[in-house]
Amino acid sequence: MAQEVDTAQGAEMRRGAGAARGRASWCWALALLWLAVVPGWSRVSGIPSRRHWPVPYKRFDFRPKPDPYCQAKYTFCPTGSPIPVMEGDDDIEVFRLQAPVWEFKYGDLLGHLKIMHDAIGFRSTLTGKNYTMEWYELFQLGNCTFPHLRPEMDAPFWCNQGAACFFEGIDDVHWKENGTLVQVATISGNMFNQMAKWVKQDNETGIYYETWNVKASPEKGAETWFDSYDCSKFVLRTFNKLAEFGAEFKNIETNYTRIFLYSGEPTYLGNETSVFGPTGNKTLGLAIKRFYYPFKPHLPTKEFLLSLLQIFDAVIVHKQFYLFYNFEYWFLPMKFPFIKITYEEIPLPIRNKTLSGL
């Protein structure tokens, strides 16, 4: 689809048929957990703040072709295939799949921190065939979270796309060994076919990955500034859509990983043209690039450790963060506890009884 589900091209290392995990080098992972910011610019004055929160995730009319500069370390969706059309009277078992991020490389290491990747499994009772469906980054997690600073370009260069991947088979051992493989519902073939049409539309219009959830504080009911758009959100959207079609889910606990930044009210800075264009704010543009500099990939160990110190100093001491969301830049005045990884329960949806005959 979007060349991903429909044509089966793809990117990621798997165990067996396995599923995709957050894919970046260990250095990117550490940097992600430490956050990023380099001092050098404070909040812009005179630019009006947007008052409608959270900022809606922007959808697009079509998925653009990736720039050749963007290269994946692990091929996206290498065993992918088109979503099949099911017989209307087929009973399709639906499974919740969850395993530690980077499990293919680090085993259960990140599972102990509850940093998990989510996917969905299906089994046709008529054919006995199993399928896996997931949504993840085309060019690994680091590229979706931080840009490249190319010397020939004034603006940071982003290799950020996420997409759905569908392939035959479920790697039972992978999901069961360190994670979860549990049936959550049974749907009809008609519901599955309806879902397949929705997945294609969702995949063609929701094109970029967003790592961060940004809130005012960890307190319940605190203002949410920005929502993430990642593998777990795809699973949640799909489950909700199946419930709209009439699927009835089991009453079991389902938890998901979320990475939070905490800040005061964000300040809107502008898009690439208004910040980095011919009439842009050169001081602001330089500050943003300095902010992202510690996240350069493939740093030598000594330089990488120095970058971590810069990150710690910036986010803890200077309380600054620049967020790129909807292809626009925002300034976040960071607040304690700055960053937090949670493993929160989000209940399975309730069936729409008016559509249960599908």
Swiss-Prot record:
Entry protein name: Bis(monoacylglycero)phosphate synthase CLN5
Notes on activation and inhibition: Anionic phospholipids activate bis(monoacylglycero)phosphate (BMP) synthase activity. Amiodarone, a cationic amphiphilic drug inhibits BMP synthase activity towards liposomal lysophosphatidylglycerol. Palmostatin B inhibits palmitoyl protein thioesterase activity.
Reaction catalysis annotation: S-hexadecanoyl-L-cysteinyl-[protein] + H2O = L-cysteinyl-[protein] + hexadecanoate + H(+)
Pfam families: CLN5
Keyword Kinase (UniProt): no
Organism name: Homo sapiens (Human)
Tissues/organs with expression: Ubiquitous.
Annotated phenotype, changing D230N: In CLN5; creates a new N-glycosylation site; retained in the endoplasmic reticulum rather than reaching the lysosome; significant decrease in palmitoyl protein thioesterase activity
Cytoplasmic side: 1-23
Glycan-modified residues: N130, N143, N178, N203, N255, N271, N281, N352
Outcome after substituting R63H: In CLN5; retained in the endoplasmic reticulum rather than reaching the lysosome
Gene: CLN5
Consequence of substituting N130Q: Loss of glycosylation. Retained in the endoplasmic reticulum rather than reaching the lysosome
Documented EC number(s): 2.3.1.-, 3.1.2.22
Gene Ontology CC: one annotated term: membrane
Top-level lineage group: Eukaryota
Residues passing through the membrane, by range: 24-40
Lumenal topology ranges: 41-358
Molecular function via GO: bis(monoacylglycero)phosphate synthase activity; D-mannose binding; hydrolase activity, acting on glycosyl bonds; long-chain fatty acyl-CoA hydrolase activity
Consequence when changing Y209D: In CLN5; significant decrease in palmitoyl protein thioesterase activity
Family, per entry: Belongs to the CLN5 family.
